[in-house]
Amino acid sequence: MQRIVLVASELAIITGHNKYEKIQKAIDSVLNRSKIVKKYIPKSKVEEKLLALSENEIVVIKKELNLEGNASLKQVENMIKQQVMTKSLNENISENESRVKADEVLKAMPTLNKCLEKSLKQDLQMRRGNIKEDKNLDKTQQKRNITIDSRNAQMYEKELYVDPDKQFNVILRGKIDGMNDEYVVETKNRTKRLFNMIPDYEKVQLNAYMFMTGKEKALHIECYNEDQNSVEYDFDKLFWDDCLSKIMSFVNEHIVGHIK
């Protein structure tokens, strides 16, 4: 029986709640991860964008980075991280200071700025969120007088669906930021402001984590610089059932036809 493996962090793309990512990215990732069709999946937004640029744009970007003409795309990506991102990743500076530091470097590289600014800042946001995650969880522990452990400690996995003809089953996988006896805990690092609400695309992930762990409650934490907001969120069966319906539509429309 063919295992179709989905990860919790991509479900909102699959269900259509995340409008910012292209569905093709999720299709390729699922096909590759499930070993149905071999695909190359870029490991960062910068790499993804570099692969889509023209040869002329790459040549100019190499010059702006003072790289040799025969430098590989990996070397270009590494130099971008080194020159543009490193100073902006300091967890002790504010989100605005982080952006300003990146902008200062990009000013001197007009082609790189034009082609890669959005991708670079998406990667920067992701990396800063990872770097600040433990600190943000510690702050919540102190503020709410609770313990948050099991931090990214385990890969959870649970079966979502089994095909009646036993051709395939659908598996959901994911790592959780933290957990205690009562909650699964998810933390988000905001770059411009607190939302003071949970967007639907993040509710998909929260319900997925509760489904995998059997917990009935989640604690959603959002952080912006030193400000923090936490909201308790109960498992929403109606919302999750709707997500499951959309997930299976995705699987049947985009994945099952590739199974040999």
Per-range role (PLM):
Residues M1-K139, K143:
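Charged, glycine-rich intrinsically disordered N-terminal tails and low-complexity linkers that flank
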Residues M126, R144-I259:
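Nucleic-acid nuclease catalytic cores
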